Amino acid sequence: KENPKIAILGLNPHNSELKKNSEEVREIIPAIRKLKTLNINCYGPIPSDTIFINEYKNFDVIVGMYHDQVLSPFKAIFKFNAINLTLGLKYLRVSPDHGTAKKLIKKNKASHESLLNCINFIKNF
C-alpha cells in the first residue's frame, strides 16, 4: 500500500497515563511527531491492551515496542496467516508468524503459509 495507516503502540500499560516522565511522553510522542513531518500516516501512542479488541481493523500496520506486545494477540486473531518484521535494522528482516515448531519435524504437519506470506511480502517490497 502506498501510504499505509500505521498504529504505534505505547510501551507502558495505559500509556502510563501520559505522565511527564513516561517513555510515551519522552520518546514515543516526539518520534510520532517527527514521522508526521515526513508525511508518514501514523497514529499513537495507542494503548496495547485495547487495540486488538477491534481498533486493529482500522490500521494496515501495527508497530509494537517489543515482541510479545504485538505477536501474542496477533497470533490469537490471525493464527499463523501473517508475518512480522523488525524495524530499525539496516536490512529488511521478516519472519513467519510462528516459532521453529521443533515438535513438527518429520511429521508432515507444518504449514508453509506464513513462509509464503514472507516471500510474497519481500517480492512486493
What are these regions (language model features)?
Residues K1-P45:
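Glycine-rich phosphate/diphosphate-binding loop of Rossmann-like nucleotide-binding domains
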Residues A31-F125:
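Glycine-rich phosphate/nucleotide-binding loop
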